[in-house]
Design a protein with these regions (language model features):
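Surface-exposed, proline-enriched loop/turn segments that connect beta strands in immunoglobulin-like
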Residues: 260-261, 300-303
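Histidine-/acidic-rich catalytic cores in large beta-rich domains
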Residues: 1-293, 317-330
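Short proline/glycine- and polar residue-rich coil/turn motifs
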Residues: 304-313
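Enriched for extracellular/lumenal, surface-exposed ectodomains of secreted and cell-surface proteins
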Residues: 332-335
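Short, solvent-exposed loop/linker segments at beta-strand-coil boundaries, enriched for Pro/Gly
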Residues: 293-299
Length: 335
C-alpha cells in the first residue's frame, strides 16, 4: 500500500504520522452523578510501533484516510482480581489491566516490534472476538483466524474457539476446536462456555450458525441462521436459561367463596395468612413482599425471599384479628 498512499501525496515512510489513527478509550461513569471517574486510553499504554501488517486494515485506511488502529471489541471486569481484560482485534492481542492503577499486567498474543507482548505468540490467534473468564482461571475467546495462514501455517483462514491457560508469565493452549474452512468468520462471532461444560461457538460463516461442542470435540447441537452478508451478519449468540427472567405467580392459600365473595376467613385473635409464590422462570428470582390491610390487622410487614428456578415457596404473615365479624381488604405487593 506504500505506492497507493504516496500517490495520494503522503510520505508513507513508516515514521511520519500523516492522518489520524483511531484508538480506544475505556470510560467509567458514576451511575448517579454521571461524572467520569476513571479512564484508560490505548494511546497511553500501547506503542504505535505495533500495528497490523497483514490483515487488510490499511485497505480501509486508504479509503477513509484514517487508520482503525486497535479496534477493542470485548471488555470484561473481574471483581475478584480487580482487573480488566480487553480484546484488541487489530493487534491480535488480549490484555489484562490492573484496576484502578491502569497498569498493564500482561499482553497476550502476536509478538510485535515494541516487545510489549510477553506471551502467547505460539498460540497464533488473530482478529479475535469475545472474552470469557472461566471458573478455572482460563480465558475463552473466539479466534477468527484471519491471519491463521501467516500465524499458524494453515492453507486458508480457519476460525476456532480456544481456551487459554495462563500461569504467571506463561500461556498455553488448553483446549481448542477448529471450524471447517467454509465456516470461517472474517468478523464477529463468539465462544461461550456453558454450564454443562460444552462450548457454544457462533460464526458468520456458512450463512451464520451456532454450534455446541462438547469437551471431546464432538458436535452435539447446531443452529443455522441462513443469513446473507453483510446485513445479515450475526454478531454474537448467548445461551440463556429462558426468555422470562421474572415470570411468577402468587396463590392465596385457603381462599374460599366465589366471585366478589372470595376471601380468607380468619379467626379472631392471633392468626396468619399465607401465600404460595411460584417461580415459573428459569432464573433465580429475588422478591420483596409487602403486606398491608385496611383494619391494620397485619400492620406493615415486609419479607424478602429468593426462589430457585421452577420452584414454589410458602410464605406466611402473622396478624391480630380484632373481630371475626369484620372484613378488611388485604393487599400484598410483590416486587
Amino acid at each position: 500500500w506504500t505506492a497507493s498512499f504516496q500517490n495520494l501525496g503522503f510520505q508513507a515512510d513508516g515514521v511520519t504520522i500523516e492522518f489520524p489513527w483511531v484508538g480506544d478509550k475505556l470510560v467509567e461513569w458514576d451511575k448517579d452523578s454521571k461524572e467520569v471517574i476513571w479512564t484508560w486510553n490505548t494511546f497511553d499504554h500501547f506503542s504505535m510501533l505495533d500495528y497490523d501488517q497483514f490483515g487488510g486494515t490499511w485497505t480501509e485506511a486508504y479509503l477513509s484516510l484514517q487508520y482503525d488502529w486497535t479496534h477493542v471489541n470485548a471488555v470484561i471486569f473481574d471483581e475478584s482480581e480487580s482487573a480488566i481484560y480487553i480484546s484488541t482485534r487489530h493487534l491480535s492481542r488480549i490484555t489484562k489491566i490492573d484496576y484502578p492503577s491502569g497498569e498493564i499486567i500482561w499482553n497476550l498474543g502476536h509478538e510485535m516490534p515494541s516487545g510489549q507482548v510477553q506471551m502467547g505468540n505460539e498460540i497464533g490467534f488473530s482478529f479475535q472476538h469475545s472474552l470469557q473468564k472461566l471458573n478455572n482461571g482460563n480465558i475463552l475467546t473466539f479466534d477468527n483466524g484471519n491471519l491463521s495462514p501467516e500465524f499458524r501455517g494453515t492453507e486458508q483462514p480457519i476460525s476456532r474457539a480456544i481456551e487459554i491457560e495462563i500461569n504467571n508469565n506463561n500461556a498455553a493452549l488448553f483446549w481448542s476446536y477448529d471450524l471447517s474452512p467454509d465456516l470461517f468468520s472474517f468478523a464477529s462471532g463468539n465462544a461461550q462456555k456453558l454450564e454443562n461444560g460444552n462450548v457454544l461457538i457462533t460464526t458468520v460463516g456458512g450463512g451464520g450458525r451456532s454450534l455446541e461442542i462438547n469437551p471431546q470435540g464432538e458436535l452435539v447441537w447446531e443452529g443455522l441462521y441462513n443469513l446473507s452478508l453483510p446485513d445479515g451478519a450475526v454478531y454474537r449468540a448467548h445461551r440463556i436459561p429462558g426468555l422470562y427472567p421474572a415470570a411468577y405467580s402468587v396463590l392465596i392459600n385457603n381462599l374460599e367463596g366465589e366471585n366478589v365473595n372470595n376471601g380468607v376467613f380468619l379467626p379472631e385473635g392471633s392468626s396468619n395468612i399465607s401465600f404460595s409464590i411460584v417461580n415459573e422462570g428459569s432464573y433465580r428470582l429475588p422478591l420483596l413482599l409487602q403486606i398491608a390491610d385496611e383494619e391494620g390487622w397485619f400492620g406493615a410487614q415486609t419479607l424478602e425471599v429468593t426462589l430457585e428456578p421452577n420452584s414454589t415457596q410458602y410464605v406466611s404473615f402473622n396478624g391480630n384479628i380484632a373481630s371475626a365479624n369484620n372484613t378488611s381488604l388485604i393487599q400484598l405487593s410483590v416486587e
